[in-house]
Design a protein with these regions (language model features):
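Acidic, metal-coordinating catalytic segment for phosphate/diphosphate chemistry
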Residues: 13-51
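Short, well-ordered beta-strand micro-motif
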Residues: 54, 132-134, 152
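Conserved Nudix-box catalytic region and its N-terminal flanking loop in Nudix hydrolases
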Residues: 58-96, 100
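Polybasic/polar functional segments that serve as interface/processing modules
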Residues: 77-78, 84, 111, 168-171
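Active-site segment of metal-dependent pyrophosphate-handling enzymes
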Residues: 99-139
């Protein structure tokens, strides 16, 4: 867990919302070692998740997936397995959901953190560490049809115009942070 705490501590924050989410995450990490999901859908609550936002470096376009369970357009990602390092989880989820070698992680750690109540009857809190991966949008993907209805490349303009209802609620803030760091 100390590796997770270091990742959270070292993450620069974008705004007051991310600062609040980081403070909650630190308090949570200080209060328990039980941070990995052990049973579906929500044990323990909260639990650790990774997102991987895939970006085409040539165009800046972002790949999102129409997630079957959440009903939202989301980045690739998923739950961190017990004892797994979040960066290892991000790389694993990327391969499982988009097919190897769909994309490669950029940098050596997460870029963003969110504390988000999920939607639906089994609502719980996902503490999400957001990573970035690079991919060429012209290359075909072998995405997981069991998990997603579809995958789609979105231009930044289209996302900023639409990234509210039907999308991961913090996506536009993540993109603002990413744009500020590049």
């Amino acid at each position: 867990m100390s590796a997770v705490r270091r990742l959270v501590d070292d993450l620069p924050v974008l705004d007051g919302i991310e600062a609040e989410h980081r403070d909650r995450a630190i308090a949570w990490l200080n209060s328990t070692a039980d941070i990995f999901r052990r049973a579906k859908p929500a044990t323990p609550d909260p639990h650790l998740v990774t997102y991987v936002v895939v970006v085409d470096p040539a165009t800046g376009d972002v790949l999102l997936a129409d997630h079957r369970l959440s009903g939202l357009w989301l980045p690739a990602g998923g739950h961190v397995d017990p004892g797994e390092h979040p960066t290892t989880s991000a790389a694993r989820e990327l391969g499982e959901e988009l097919g190897p070698p769909a994309a490669s992680l950029v940098g050596d750690g997460p870029r963003f953190l969110t504390w988000t109540p999920t939607r639906g009857p089994d609502s719980h809190v996902d503490v999400s560490l957001w990573y970035v991966a690079a991919a060429d949008r012209s290359r075909p993907l072998e995405w997981d049809r069991r998990e997603f209805h579809a995958v789609r490349w979105w231009s930044r303009t289209a996302l900023l115009d639409r990234a509210t209802e039907g999308f991961e609620p913090h996506l536009s803030r993540f993109l603002a942070k990413l744009d500020g760091s590049t």
